Structure formats: structure tokens, C-alpha cells
Design a protein with these regions (language model features):
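Catalytic-loop region of hydrolases
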Residues: 2-12, 23-169, 203, 292-295, ...
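Glycine-rich nucleophile elbow surrounding the catalytic serine of serine-hydrolase chemistry
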Residues: 116, 204, 222-234
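A catalytic-pocket lid/entrance helix-loop region that shapes and gates access to the active site
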Residues: 153-164, 232-296, 344-355, 359-365, ...
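Short beta-strand/loop motif that positions the catalytic acidic residue
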Residues: 442, 447-450
């Protein structure tokens, strides 16, 4: 069977509407690594009503495989006051295919923040080797505030959800007003809940779920933002982390403004690589026979589109659109070149293919969510801001003037995307975090997996996480393109990760693999789709982790 890359699934998707399965059951974990981090730190048995409940599993929907089961458990909104308001946590499972060989449970997270994880067991069932399916019950959750787990909303319009905005002197005042309005609307619609939609609380939910399932430890496969969730879990509950695979990693020290800014920093070497790639194939693509000439061709088209937007298949594409789209596209030079050639054709009045622009204008996946009945249309964006602003409000300046200065400076340093990354965001007007940021510095063993050319979590980000997790090992895929590594059909990476999941033994030292032509071709193919064939969850979201 042809394998497809199980890349980070960064968008809400309800293309297959999951019938709500309402079971009010939960449990509390045993003592954690510290009283401050443990749900069981509650006094006087306040979590007893959770510990005595059990999930009531039911088939998720008639059209889904019978083994794909769903339930809903209850968790405290505020772990400091577990006797107060409770919220739903939607969970799913596919049980081990070899009960006699079962090791435990493998929880997964697709990324985001704001990505639904309830469908992950279905995707993993198709992609993981049979030996792993025998070893684990596959567990999925919609993190708190997301999807079926008491979804939050800010009642944002589609225009208000558009948050990667280039800096322009003449529009900055409007951008500040937009950022303030988003923060105000979020407070108005979900103010009582949003302060508790954080990664630390989601990690506590994961540990509570571990106890509900009757497991002493939990294994984990997290992509992109999911690597940060996994790292925070190991910090709060190091003794309960079993086999942790962190694919396409976030640097905890840069959560979250620094990670957005890393999109701009990481794009510059990728852009230079692209100009060299295109120049070496000038006879095919005609963009210039030296990197300098390709660079000039690119910026000339940006300038033309800023003066007169390019019209293609009903789209009007500005120079800012080209810069923003190219930021992610250049990490796959072939896809970027093909897309740019079509833009140039359209600008020159020639017939062009809008389909080839998919690598350029990849969907954030909100379309399916807008058709859903029970999930607010802006849920992914609302939950994204709750986490990105609420995890570490200290990372976000409060003075709009600081954003203006940073955007101007970073556009100079990183001309492709610097102003997009550093300009004003709603976090400037967000309430202060209820807890301090999580410093990840522990000895829980984890396996970090990272492509060299990743548009969302650059290689230095994974290297930083590897340094913070003292007993971790890292698999680096030299020449690897795309966001998300495992499984990819690459014998080196797949063998290392699967071996760890099956045995629990980390490699003796960090591992370096080389990308294969097939795995990079799949990355390019996936980049040009809005969703992976056969998956209910869209593949790409260029404005998420």
C-alpha cells in the first residue's frame, strides 16, 4: 500500500460529522511531580467525582469503522478550583489489535493550537505499522476549548480571523484597532473560559485522561504544537511519560511570539536555497540562470503586483500576497518554482494554472469547520489565540508602538515575511496569563524528529527542544522537506521511530537520516492539496503550528 505522510493536521475538520457521544465520566490522576502541577493537589478529595466515573464508549458514527469509538469525559475548567465549573473533553479510541501484546495507550495530537485530535486514531490506524497497532490503544482528544470539547468562540468574521498582516504605515492604525477588537470580542464571548484554555491545563487533562483509562503511564505522538504539549506534559508529570515522540518541534522558550517570528527568520535561508534551485534549472523555468537573477525576478514581480494586483482565476494577488505565500512555499523549491512561474505568466497576460498555486495559497482548513453544525465557525482561531496569548502573555509587548518598530526592523532583516511575523497581534490586548510560562528542563526521555527544511518549526527550534529535554534523542532528516516526518516511507526515520515505540529504547545517540526522493515528492504533493486523500482532516495550515 502506498503510504502518505502523516503530516501535522493543523486544522479543524468536520467533513465527517462526528455524532456527539455524551458520557459524563472522568478520573483524577495520582500525585504528580509537584503539588502545583498535579490535579490531585486539590484538597479534601475534591476530585473524587472525577475518579469514580468511567467513559461510556460508543461507536462514533454509523459511517465510521465499528472499532472507532467515542466518549465524553468531564474535566475541571480550573484545576485550582476542581469543585467549580466542569467542561467536556471529547475523546476517541481504536483498541489494540493484539491484546496479548498490548503495551498501553498512544495518545496523539495533530498540532494547532486549535486542531481537533479526535480523528487522529483513524489516520494512525491507516499509517502505523501493524506491530504498533498491536502494541497500543490509539487515543485521540479534542483539546479543551476545541471542536467537541466545550468549544470557545470569539464570534469573529472571516476578515477578523485573518491575522498575518503585512506592516504598512498607512494601515497600521487599522491593524491596531483590529487586534484590539479581536481581544475585546474574545473577552465578551468567552471571557470566563479563555483564561483556562492553556497548554498547561491541556497537559493536566491528558494526565487526568491517563488515570481515567487506568494507565500508570502514557505514550504520546505529537506533531508541531503537539510537541509543545508533549514537552509541557513531561515537565509537569515526568514520571508518567512513557514513550514520547515529538515530531516537528516547537522551542518552548519561544512560545509564542518568538515562534511566529521564527517563520520569518527560517524563510530567509529557504528562500536562498530556492533561488539556487531555480537558477540551476533556468532552461526549464526561465527565472534566471544565477541566484541573484532569480532573486531580482522575484522582487520585480512583487513590485508589479503591489502596483497592479495579478488576476488569476478570480483571485487578485498583491505583492504582499506573493511574499506571504512564498514564505511557506520556498521550503519545497520545486513547488515554489512551479507556483511562481504561473504567477509570472498571469502577470504577463499568459494563460496560467490556478491549481499550481495551491502550494502558495494553501488553505488553513476553515471551510469544513464553517459547515459544521455544533462547532463555532471561528473555533480554531479563538482557541488558537487563547493558547498563543494565554500561555505566556509576558512574551507579547503591550505597547503597539513596539510592534510597529519591530515590524519595520524585521522587514529589513527578513524581507520575505518579517513584517507579517512581528506586526501587531491580539495578544497585545489580551488579559495577563493566570500562570507563568512553562520552562521545559527535565530528564524525561523523548524522541524528537525533524526535517531540515520545515516551514513551520525550523530546525533550530527542534534543536532547542532537544537541549531542554536532557535525556531526549533527535532524528534529523537532512534535505527533508515539509512539516511532519513520521511516518514517511523513509526507512531510516520510520525504522528509528517505530523501533522506539515498540521497545521503548531510545537510540544511543542522535540520529541523522537523509531524505529520500519519494518522501520529499510526497511532501510536495501534499503541499499542493488542501487535504490528504482519505483523511477527514485538512493537511495544510500555513498560519498554525
Amino acid at each position: 500500500m502506498r503510504r502518505r505522510r502523516l503530516a501535522p493536521l493543523l486544522a479543524v475538520s468536520l467533513t465527517a460529522t462526528l455524532a456527539p457521544v455524551l458520557a459524563t465520566s472522568t478520573a483524577a490522576p495520582a500525585a504528580a511531580s509537584s503539588a502545583a502541577s498535579s490535579p490531585s493537589a486539590a484538597k479534601g478529595g475534591a476530585l473524587d467525582r472525577y475518579t469514580k466515573q468511567k467513559p461510556k464508549w460508543k461507536r462514533c458514527e454509523a459511517a465510521a469503522p465499528a472499532e472507532f469509538q467515542c466518549a465524553t469525559i468531564k474535566v475541571p475548567l480550573d484545576y485550582r478550583a476542581p469543585g467549580g465549573k466542569r467542561i467536556d473533553l471529547a475523546i476517541s479510541r481504536i483498541s489494540s489489535t493484539g491484546p496479548g501484546k498490548r503495551h498501553g495507550v498512544l495518545l496523539s495530537n495533530p498540532g494547532g493550537p486549535g486542531g481537533q485530535g479526535i480523528y487522529m486514531p483513524l489516520a494512525l490506524q491507516e499509517e502505523l505499522p501493524e506491530a504498533a497497532l498491536r502494541k497500543y490503544d490509539l487515543i485521540g482528544i479534542d483539546p479543551r476549548g476545541v471542536g467537541r470539547s466545550t468549544p470557545v468562540t470569539c464570534d469573529l468574521t472571516q476578515e477578523e480571523e485573518n491575522w498575518l498582516r503585512p506592516y504598512k504605515k498607512e494601515t497600521f492604525t487599522k491593524d491596531v484597532a483590529w487586534a484590539r477588537k479581536v481581544a475585546d470580542k474574545c473577552r465578551e464571548k468567552s471571557g470566563a473560559v479563555l483564561p483556562h484554555i492553556t497548554t498547561r491545563n491541556t497537559a493536566r487533562d491528558v494526565d487526568l485522561l491517563r488515570a481515567v483509562l487506568g494507565e500508570k503511564k502514557i505514550s504520546y505522538l505529537g506533531y508541531s504544537y503537539g510537541t509543545y504539549l508533549g514537552a509541557v506534559y513531561t515537565q509537569l508529570f515526568p514520571g508518567r511519560a512513557d514513550r514520547f515522540v515529538l515530531d516537528s518541534a516547537v522551542d518552548p522558550a519561544r512560545a509564542w511570539r518568538g515562534m511566529v517570528q521564527w517563520w520569518a527568520e527560517g524563510a530567509e535561508p529557504a528562500f536562498d536555497r530556492w533561488t539556487g534551485w531555480a537558477a540551476a534549472r533556468s532552461e526549464t523555468y526561465g527565472l534566471g540562470d544565477t541566484p541573484k537573477k532569480v532573486d531580482r525576478t522575484f522582487w520585480e514581480l512583487v513590485a508589479r503586483a503591489d502596483e497592479k494586483p495579478i488576476e488569476l482565476d478570480g483571485l487578485l494577488i498583491t505583492g504582499d500576497d506573493i511574499r506571504g505565500g512564498m514564505r511557506g512555499a520556498v521550503f519545497s523549491p520545486q513547488s515554489a518554482t512551479e507556483a511562481f512561474v504561473e504567477l509570472k505568466k498571469a502577470a504577463d497576460g499568459e494563460t496560467a494554472s490556478a491549481k499550481k498555486l495551491a502550494a502558495f495559497t494553501g488553505s488553513a482548513g476553515t471551510g469544513a469547520a464553517r459547515e459544521a453544525v455544533e462547532v463555532p465557525q471561528d473555533n480554531m482561531t479563538a482557541s488558537f489565540w487563547a493558547v498563543v496569548c494565554g500561555d505566556n502573555s509576558a512574551a507579547w509587548p503591550r505597547n503597539p508602538e513596539r510592534y510597529r518598530q519591530d515590524a519595520i526592523a524585521d522587514k529589513g532583516r527578513y524581507p520575505l515575511f518579517g513584517d507579517f511575523a512581528s506586526s501587531i497581534k491580539p495578544c497585545a490586548f489580551w488579559n495577563r496569563s493566570v500562570e507563568p510560562a512553562t520552562q521545559v528542563d527535565n530528564k524525561a526521555g523523548s524522541l524528537i524528529v525533524q526535517n531540515e527544511w520545515d516551514s513551520q518549526t525550523p530546525l533550530p527550534s527542534a534543536q532547542a527542544l532537544n537541549k531542554g529535554l536532557k535525556r531526549s534523542r533527535m532524528v534529523t532528516v537532512l534535505g527533508g522537506e515539509g512539516h511532519g516526518v513520521y511516518p514517511s516511507g523513509n526507512a531510516c526515520t520510520d525504522g528509528t521511530v517505530t523501533g522506539y515505540l515498540l521497545t521503548g529504547k531510545l537510540p544511543a545517540r542522535d540520529v541523522t537520516c537523509r531524505a529520500t526522493a519519494e518522501s520529499n515528492a510526497e511532501a510536495r504533493e501534499n503541499q499542493q492539496r488542501e487535504e490528504i486523500p482519505g483523511s477527514p482532516i485538512p493537511e495544510r495550515a500555513p498560519d498554525r503550528f
